[in-house]
């Protein structure tokens, strides 16, 4: 780069100035003759001019070849036009050859006219005429040779349709018929104006709407959701003339899913942005204000608007994306669309409900409820539902054979359940105690098979291994063991207490070292609710001391909870009531072969005498475990409320299952308690034998192996009554009984063996017996007592819970309410028992609600809805009334029935119970009606007797001339009271004297008033005679 200075200006020259020229210029500058200013300036001008010419010639020579090469492009660009592309780029767009030819001809024409005008002779124009002589010569436009076209000429002929012309009335009629056809066939309607508007008819809440397609349904959020011109608007207004357009919408009726609905803005109650008063096209809500799709909104507002688009579109978008990602990539055929899409939707819904039943697929509570269900619950609840879905597919969609095969296999897998409990029990009885091969393998296979569908892959492998071992060993393998005798029998108690790891784990103890039940506490309520009674402390402990059994009695030490401060009296509580002494005999032992099974025998001392039980002191709200060793006291899971629980009638053995619950994992507590309640207890019943109880424990130990080490409560043996007594926290006042040595569930299971030689396995285990009550007879008693005050008074005082049986019939409940019995019960119990007073008040309120219902089914629905509230209010512990448990069971049954009916209704099934209430009402209502008729009859008789007595006294007292007038007044008064017409005999002719006719005499109001005044005066004066 070089520089040159022109005066005070400095110019930069390119490298075109050669170094030699620069040296020559510098030498010329240094000559003396050139140092003058004028010469220097001239020299600089010459040098600069030569350098510039040299640069221009070099530049021209460099660009000359490129310009020649690009000359055709420049020629085309002359006829090109500039266009702006999408991102603002401006470029040339080439023109076609026809366009260039047209332009050239136009230029030629213009140049020819200009040439002729300029070269023509000058003349003064006086007139305009055509000069035929040509004054100038013009070269004609060269002929352009067109390229031949090698394409086949089109054979299409232009079809010109005749224009349709209609009058205004004909056009209106035509559009109405198009709208009716689209509405009937579900077709789309397109209105072509400046913008195309597409819509269709849809139904919502039994109303028909016209729905237009708006832009936000495609996923965008534009400022204008829909653009309508006036012509399109008039046509749209004609198509939108539906029931939904004329319907008056209350506040909140415009909901999501109604985007594009055309409604009348004058019939909307919600606040809205109105575009005009003719139409309102729903877009969504912005700050609780409805927005019309035609309204212009800002970009920020369009993002803030809650669009009322169809929520199902989001579902199908996710379904489609996931389906495309998960579909099979490698198939041996080309997939085609053979099945109907709508039917595919029906079948997909059936499969969804069969696999994961729910009320809504978006409901989180349904999802959590299903995830918390055990396998047994799912199988019991949904196996029949799957069978129904399978039948629906078979009947309506037989072409979906693959779905039918899937549902069938899925149902069979869910029903894989081994219900052969008898076979399991028999195998356990025969060889359950045998630990040697091959019996140990048989027992293990028996334990695995009873699991049924709960077997895992590892269980199948283990079962196959045991079957292989069975093939290797023979069955007839015996051992000879020396036999023992009763005289040499010793079964001393263990010197060490059993170590219960569950009660020693720090993670399951609180800061005070007490056992923490956790989730087991909630599930233990299934035991306390069904098999325990709450002790009412206000009634004392005396009624709970004596525990009766089918073969005798035993006294509890619960009365010792009331202690005296007198030490001498306190020492007397340490003395129990001794039972009949029973020596060690064969009944105290259990043998298998010639060997004693010591855990199934009674405990003895070192000298062979039996260990007899002493008085066992009571405690409050504890579960006492540990049979032969030191006892452990565990807080009851429901002891926080301070209530005391005692085992119900015949269910003392429930304490054993409660002790097993300590060793159950918290996540299995629900399944364990339900298995005991629904499977074990119904089979055991009340007062089961020890063999059945041990078999049930073995069944639970197979399903829940951790319960084998669970400690047992103390078990006393009464050989005289042949009874096992499971001691609870209230101890035992009876002493002198034997003590069973079994300390764990695993040891107690030995009683289930059929090969065990022991008379004790037939002993009974349990509690009190239950008296059964007949519901129908008690309801009849309640109906009879409604109109008999003496019986009702006895019921209110002795069996107040019998009033709850009125919920079985709305007629009985309202008759009880109308007779005032519920009000009397409330007044009677308000000062004696607040719980009973609250129950009678609830029945009164329920009767008032029932009276408002017009039909019998509606009345039963009101009662069913309040059954749960009544059950929770009534079922509070145990009560000393025979009708208490009957009322509780009735309410629990109604509560369970209502819950199951709601579940069926939610799943879409119909309930047939609505057809049966009138049968029950028909059976019970005649008793109520007959009682009411008897009361009316008795009232009429008493009224007539009273009036007759007054008339008789009046006739004896007053003058005879006034008797006839008084009789007439009394007759009027009687007709008014009894609502009967007056019967007056009239004298007829001699032929009709023997006949009498009863005529209706009209009642005179003044005469009746006067008769009443006379009667009142008479009764006040002669009340003693009357």
UniProtKB/Swiss-Prot annotation:
The record marks 308-309, 766-767 as: Cleavage. A motif (Involved in virions binding and aphid transmission) lies at residues 618-620. It holds the Pfam family Potyvirid-P3. Potyviral RNA is expressed as two polyproteins which undergo post-translational proteolytic processing. Genome polyprotein is processed by NIa-pro, P1 and HC-pro proteinases resulting in the production of at least ten individual proteins. P3N-PIPO is cleaved by P1 and HC-pro proteinases resulting in the production of three individual proteins. The P1 proteinase and the HC-pro cleave only their respective C-termini autocatalytically. The active site is at 216 (for p1 proteinase activity), 225 (for p1 proteinase activity), 259 (for p1 proteinase activity), 652 (for helper component proteinase activity), 725 (for helper component proteinase activity). Coiled coil: none annotated. One of its GO terms (biological process) is proteolysis. Residues 644-766 form the Peptidase C6 domain. GO terms for cellular component: host cell plasmodesma. The keyword Transport applies. It comes from the Viruses. Residues 165-308 form the Peptidase S30 domain. The keyword Transport applies. InterPro entries: HC-pro, HC_PRO_CPD_dom, HC_PRO_CPD_sf, Pept_S30_P1_potyvir, Potyvirid-P3. One of its GO terms (molecular function) is cysteine-type endopeptidase activity. Keywords: Host cell junction, Host-virus interaction, Hydrolase, Inhibition of host innate immune response by virus, Protease, Serine protease, Suppressor of RNA silencing, Transport, Viral immunoevasion, Viral movement protein. Disulfide bonds: none annotated. The N-terminus of helper component proteinase is involved in interaction with stylets. The central part is involved in interaction with virions and the C-terminus is involved in cell-to cell movement of the virus. Belongs to the potyviridae P3N-PIPO polyprotein family. This is P3N-PIPO polyprotein. It comes from Plum pox potyvirus (strain SK 68) (PPV). The lineage of its organism: Viruses, Riboviria, Orthornavirae, Pisuviricota, Stelpaviricetes.
């Amino acid at each position: 780069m070089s520089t040159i200075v022109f005066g005070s200006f400095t110019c930069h020259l390119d490298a075109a100035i050669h170094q030699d020229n620069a040296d020559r210029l510098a030498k010329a500058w240094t000559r003396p003759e050139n140092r003058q200013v004028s010469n220097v300036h001239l020299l600089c001008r010459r040098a600069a001019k030569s350098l510039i010419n040299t640069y221009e010639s070099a530049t021209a020579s460099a660009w000359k070849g490129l310009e020649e090469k690009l000359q055709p492009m420049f020629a085309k660009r002359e006829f090109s036009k500039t266009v702006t592309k999408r991102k603002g780029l401006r470029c040339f767009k080439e023109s076609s050859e026809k366009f260039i030819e047209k332009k050239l001809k136009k230029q030629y024409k213009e140049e020819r006219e200009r040439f002729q005008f300029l070269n023509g002779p000058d003349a003064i124009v006086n007139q305009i005429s055509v000069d035929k002589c040509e004054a100038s010569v013009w070269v004609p436009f060269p002929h352009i040779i067109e390229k031949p076209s090698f394409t086949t000429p089109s054979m299409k002929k232009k079809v010109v349709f005749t224009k349709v012309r209609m009058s205004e009335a004909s056009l209106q009629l035509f559009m109405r018929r198009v709208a009716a056809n689209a509405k009937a066939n579900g077709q789309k309607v397109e209105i072509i104006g400046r913008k195309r508007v597409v819509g269709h008819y849809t139904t919502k809440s039994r109303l028909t709407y016209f729905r237009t397609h708006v832009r936000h349904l495609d996923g965008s959020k534009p400022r204008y959701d829909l653009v309508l011109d006036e012509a399109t608007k008039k046509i749209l207004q004609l198509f939108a003339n539906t029931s939904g357009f004329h319907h008056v919408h209350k506040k909140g009726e415009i909901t999501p899913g109604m985007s594009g609905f055309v409604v009348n803005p004058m019939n909307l109650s919600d606040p809205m942005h109105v575009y005009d008063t003719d139409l309102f096209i729903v877009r969504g809500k912005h700050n609780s204000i409805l927005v019309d799709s035609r309204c212009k909104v800002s970009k920020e507002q369009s993002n803030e608007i809650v669009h009322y688009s169809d929520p199902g579109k989001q579902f199908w978008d996710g379904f489609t994306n996931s389906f495309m990602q998960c579909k099979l990539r490698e198939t041996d055929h080309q997939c085609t669309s053979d099945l109907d899409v709508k039917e595919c939707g029906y079948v997909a819904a059936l499969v969804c409900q069969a696999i994961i039943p729910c009320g809504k697929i978006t409901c989180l509570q349904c999802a959590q409820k299903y995830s918390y269900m055990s396998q047994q619950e799912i199988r019991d609840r949904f196996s029949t539902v799957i069978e129904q879905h399978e039948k629906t597919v078979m009947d309506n969609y037989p072409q979906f054979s693959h779905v039918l095969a899937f549902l069938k296999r899925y149902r069979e897998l869910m029903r894989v359940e081994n219900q052969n409990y008898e076979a399991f029990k028999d195998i356990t009885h025969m060889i359950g105690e045998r630990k040697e091969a091959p019996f140990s393998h048989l027992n293990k296979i028996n334990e695995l098979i009873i699991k049924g569908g709960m077997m895992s892959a590892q269980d199948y492998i283990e079962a196959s291994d045991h079957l292989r071992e069975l093939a290797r060993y023979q069955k007839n393998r015996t051992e000879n063991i020396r036999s023992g005798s009763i005289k040499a029998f010793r079964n001393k108690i263990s010197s060490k207490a059993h170590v219960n790891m569950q009660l020693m784990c720090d993670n399951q103890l609180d800061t005070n070292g007490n056992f923490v039940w956790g989730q087991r506490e909630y599930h233990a309520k299934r035991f306390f609710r069904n098999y325990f009674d709450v002790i009412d402390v206000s009634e004392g402990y005396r009624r709970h001391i004596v525990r009766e059994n089918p073969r005798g009695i035993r006294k509890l030490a619960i009365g010792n909870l009331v202690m005296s401060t007198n030490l001498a009296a306190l020492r007397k509580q340490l003395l129990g009531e001794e039972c009949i002494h029973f020596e060690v005999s064969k009944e105290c032992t259990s043998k298998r072969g010639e060997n004693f099974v010591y855990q199934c025998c009674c405990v003895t001392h070192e000298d062979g005498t039996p260990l007899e039980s002493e008085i066992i002191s009571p405690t409050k709200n504890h579960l006492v475990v540990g049979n032969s060793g030191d006892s452990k006291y565990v807080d009851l899971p429901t002891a926080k409320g301070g209530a005391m629980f005692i085992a119900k009638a015949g269910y003392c053995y429930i304490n054993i299952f409660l002790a097993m619950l300590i060793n159950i994992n918290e996540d299995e507590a629900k399944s364990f308690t339900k298995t005991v309640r629904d499977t074990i207890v119904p089979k055991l019943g009340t007062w089961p034998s020890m063999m059945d109880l041990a078999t049930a424990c073995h069944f639970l130990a197979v399903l829940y192996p951790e319960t084998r080490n669970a400690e047992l409560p103390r078990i006393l043996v009464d050989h005289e009554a042949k009874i096992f007594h499971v001691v609870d926290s209230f101890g035992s006042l009876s002493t002198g009984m034997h003590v069973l040595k079994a300390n764990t569930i695993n040891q107690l299971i030995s009683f289930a063996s059929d090969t065990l030689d022991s008379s004790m396995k037939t002993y009974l285990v349990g509690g009190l017996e239950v008296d059964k009550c007949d519901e129908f007879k008690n309801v009849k008693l309640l109906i009879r007592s409604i109109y008999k005050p003496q019986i009702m008074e006895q019921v209110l005082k002795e069996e107040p819970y019998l009033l709850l049986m009125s919920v079985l019939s709305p007629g009985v409940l309202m008759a009880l309410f109308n007779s005032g019995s519920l009000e009397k019960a409330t007044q009677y119990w308000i000062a004696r028992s607040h719980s009973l007073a609250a129950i009678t008040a609830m029945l009164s309120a329920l009767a008032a609600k029932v009276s408002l219902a017009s039909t019998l089914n509606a009345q039963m629905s009101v009662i069913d809805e309040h059954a749960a509230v009544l059950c929770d209010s009534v079922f509070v512990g145990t009560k000393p009334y025979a009708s208490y448990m009957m009322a509780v069971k009735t309410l629990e049954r109604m509560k369970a029935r209502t819950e199951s009916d709601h579940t069926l209704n939610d799943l879409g099934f119909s309930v047939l119970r609505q057809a049966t209430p009138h049968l029950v009402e028909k059976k019970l209502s005649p008793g109520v009606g007959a009682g009411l008729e008897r009361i009316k009859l008795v009232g009429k008789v008493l009224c007539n007797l009273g009036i007759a007595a007054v008339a008789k006294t009046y006739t004896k007292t007053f003058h005879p001339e006034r008797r006839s007038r008084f009789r007439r007044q009394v007759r009027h008064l009687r007709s008014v009271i009894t609502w009967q017409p007056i019967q007056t005999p009239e004298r007829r002719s001699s032929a009709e004297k023997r006949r009498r006719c009863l005529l209706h005499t009209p009642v005179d109001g003044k005469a009746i008033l006067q008769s009443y005044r006379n009667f009142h005066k008479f009764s006040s004066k002669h009340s003693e005679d009357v």
